């Protein structure tokens, strides 16, 4: 009985103290036991019938229906009797149940534990309280006794001493039932007594070194109450005012296991039943499962709240000692970190986190989280041990996070973009995490500076599982670092922070739950913030490291094209011992073995590559030595080459250590002095020794290059001598290339392509020949290309020489000839005071340009022009123009200003200007310069006079192109006589729109046209004796036939108009008048006289009607003008028809040019053609001829007698000239409008819009001799766009212009109503080749408009 549980012990004690116990007491006891067992069996089913009403505010009152729970007393009595009979069997079963419970719970149940739970009450008190409790419980329902043992009740803060579980009475009526437990629960089903709360006491001990996965969170300290969590089933004091057994604070020494064991026997020891074993086992399993579930719920709950929240929640646990509180604080912090990192890891994959953006974000989040948490190496308690729950001040923070941010941004580019190491793509894979090892960072060698992080190797595999196996208390400062480092590396606080940043940003897979480990594993090289030095190790311990550093620096300084050259060129492996190459890196160099091996391979490959380049250079040197026969080689042998000098200066290792290939920082100011004595003026040396700079070295330099290779064989290659030799070779190579590149020379790689040219083309000879080409001294127009380009074939040399000659001649003569003509045009337009005699300047310039064009053609054909050709050209030019004009003409000056070096084919030298006294003299042999461009035209015009024939035969005709006519008559009183414009110029433009080039096809075409019309023109001239003409020597040197009528008309020019003209023009008119007066005595034919000439002379004013610019203005004026001229129809016109019948097949009229200013010298010729047309159309009426003859005689007499009638006619002519000249300029628009209403233009009975006439250039040339003042006035109405078609055939344009010529003179035309046998429709010249069925001029104009 000593070892029985407290209920049985209590019962046994009470039974001993009451010897007079009756059998009914035994029946009651057995009934209670059986009722309790039955209640436990029905308890899972009774949970579904809980009361949903809230508890009443009064402690003993409940509103649940009592009928459901209560049983009748009669049934209870019967049940008690039956239970009394089964009492012996129940006791036996109870003892068996107790033994099974002891076997299941193990050795945790001992007497001491029971004493702590039951209390130190003496047996007397227990015996005294037992009857009271028994009597009191006998009056209460037995079903309501179970909830009083529920451990879910909150502890009473007023209780200060533990009370006995069996002897402590309830403060109020025991009305708490199972239905009261569900008052604050959700409607889902739950386990009543077998389901503990979500925050139960820990079921198992939680030592710091062996955490159990099923362990729940530790309980809070004494004096704390647990606040209700979510999904909680706790009954707080507010929900349950009356509890059966108010529990005090459990002592700290009591473990969770003891608490659980103590509660189970108290429940199961109240009675005996077969179902007790199964109920207790199920309760035990449920407790374990719920504890594990609550642990996961707690972690999930803590992960969704900030650290302050879960610290507060962790503090609300109970039954926690001071050591347990520290352990719980550490565990809660670590759990929160793990949850944070797990959430971050779920965002993306591992490859995404390896990107620089993920590293940056993870590092920022880590810095923020570390700033918010405390230093876990020295954890502080989370709670005070006093009665009041109060949290300590905020946790201690690490160093300023701005330091981390500065260091991170400073090394950000090196962290992520400094890789791959040595800018080699083969090392990309090793920059990140490998399978067996973790590298902090590969050395990010950059071009401009070295990295401040040393390549340290992590030898052990870091895994989160490794740290979970060790308790947090072991992670102290004495923890050994996991990174192997050399003794020379001493971590600094700044370096530690950087190492932490590198670890946390580069390896986010590591759990940050152990910052103390990361803190102790920071290894980095000491570095300054401004200038970072690479590999700052004592050179005394490792003497080969300075050389390695210089090699790495030199490797970094080399351009990228050198590093990638192994893909382009095939390298040849030199015969170097393997030991010398493997000893490039020192043994204790702080890099991983794999990275070390790749670095060595990379350096070997680079050395081999440059060695192969040197071998190729030497092969080219050998090849060039075989061909080295020029004297420049001996001179090159005399002086040391840049390579040789650089080799001599770089032999000592002391100087080699000072050489650093910092090409990026210092491109070249002093590199030539460091790498060798390069010539200061390489361009001068290249001229004298072209092969020295271009790479042709002597045998001595070759020996000096290979000499160190032979001497370094053997044991010396194992030491620093080999490295010095390699450095010298690279230094010489780079210095040589750099010197050539800086001076703009050809690099070594293209030397082979220069060999042939270098041997055959010396630089000095090339310069000499080039200067000779620029200014040749001899007249031989060829270049000796055999000496300059000896490597070419003879045929190629000959063709190249011919091409050079033609090209030179073209560019030497072509541009001046093309520019000369527009220049002359501009100059002549600007000079308005030039006389008519100065118009020969453009003609002479054109002759010279024509001769120059022949010279140019001959030069292109490699035929030097003969001296006779030059003489002929100069003779024609001198005969064509006066010497004074020749000397003063711009063409002559331009010709005299020929630069030196131009080949001269004139043996007599340049022409000299005539003396000043001979400026006004005319040449003895005037040149018959027909502006039509043909000798046949001059012959046809000169058939009227033998003097003209002699002049034509004296000097041959010089053919000039189309532009000659335009330039020759460009400035015939350009500004004063505004009606005279050049054909190639518009009204407001000074620039000619025609080409200034010579075209032989145009010359041939003009000649054919003139030959076609020559017979008719000559016949017509010979068969018209009634027209008197005189050969006049015009001021421009042209012999022209001027009829007498022209003399009269010229003499009729009013004196006022002559006074308004410039002095040069007036002088020209006076000279013309004197010449014509001198020729009157030599007339061959006599003129018939007619007394009716006065009528025709008086009616000369309407003879020059204006040409309006529209047909609408012509139509009304046409009828008026026809009525006005109706009185001119007399029977005296019949002789004209007879004359026309004899010559209608031979008459050829010349075209009047549109924008063409005929000079005064051609005025008589135009009038002659006009009268020829009159007499050819009217053969039946010879009276007008007599009238015209009498008119010319009358006019001639009026000139000398100064009669009033002649003066009036001249005044009228002058007024008409002024009015017509004003039509071509915009500033005389008002005058033009006035004259439009005054004058009319009859157009052969039909309106014809002459604005749409299109002529060819040759038609203009042929009509120039027949152009007159009326033609000029007519051409003013033509548009400027007629120049668009200039190369059309002149046949139809001749006919059309003849019609236009006749339409301009209304005094000889009949009105519409007159029936006259003379009609322009019947008497067109048949030699023109056109049919006579064209009825009116607009039809011909439309024909030419469509051509």
Swiss-Prot record:
Transmembrane segments: 23-43
Entry keyword rRNA-binding: no
Disulfide topology: none
Subcellular localization: Membrane
GO-annotated cellular components: membrane
Compositionally biased spans, kind Basic and acidic residues: 1108-1127, 1137-1146
PANTHER family the record matches: ACROSOME-SPECIFIC PROTEIN, SPERMATOGENESIS-ASSOCIATED PROTEIN 31A1-RELATED
Name of the molecule in the record: Spermatogenesis-associated protein 31A1
